[in-house]
């Protein structure tokens, strides 16, 4: 009788384990399968640079104590497109005051970045560039900071520009900040 009961329990446990592994994993309301299908069928929308940024409206965000540059996003340029790309104007200011201005995109699901245009003297120069993987420890750490802390919580793009602006003002997206608090 005990052997029969042990076999039954083992069978039920095995069936339950098999059932759990077949359930789709869900991120941001989408299953892994849905995310993979979107990645395979993805098409980028046509992109044009926004109006040139104004210094007085820029929002600063922290990158690292290792850099002497200061980094800013123009809130007026921030968009979350129907193609799942968060686009924004980035300003990197050197200690001497020189500004590197770029119009960029983050593809959250793929963890990739792309530069659409370079800025200078109040105007944009379009740039043909490919999507590149965001490397957490690369020289260009600001991409990882914007990806991980502000615009791509849980690998999903922000839903609205206002959500991204609020994340910049708070020092991080609420979903990320809450997750960090729960890990402590």
Language-model features: where?
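N-terminal secretory-pathway/extracellular module detecting exported/lumenal segments
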Residues: 19-103, 107-184
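N-terminal signal peptide c-region/cleavage motif recognized by signal peptidases
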Residues: 13-15
């Amino acid at each position: 009788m005990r052997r029969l009961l042990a076999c039954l329990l083992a069978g039920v446990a095995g069936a339950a384990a098999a059932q759990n592994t077949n359930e789709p994993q869900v991120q941001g309301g989408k299953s892994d399968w849905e995310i993979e299908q979107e990645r395979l069928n993805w098409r980028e929308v046509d992109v044009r640079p926004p109006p040139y940024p104004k210094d007085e409206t820029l929002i600063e965000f922290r990158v690292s104590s290792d850099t002497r540059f200061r980094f800013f996003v123009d809130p007026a340029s921030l968009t979350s497109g129907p193609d799942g790309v968060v686009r924004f104007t980035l300003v990197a200011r050197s200690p001497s005051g020189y500004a590197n201005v770029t119009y960029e995109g983050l593809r959250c699901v793929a963890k990739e970045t792309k530069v659409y245009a370079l800025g200078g003297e109040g105007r944009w120069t379009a740039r043909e560039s490919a999507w590149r993987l965001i490397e957490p420890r690369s020289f260009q750490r600001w991409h990882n900071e914007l990806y991980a802390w502000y615009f791509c919580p849980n690998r999903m793009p922000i839903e609205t520009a206002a959500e991204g602006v609020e994340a910049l003002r708070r020092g991080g997206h609420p979903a990320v900040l809450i997750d960090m608090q729960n890990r402590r």
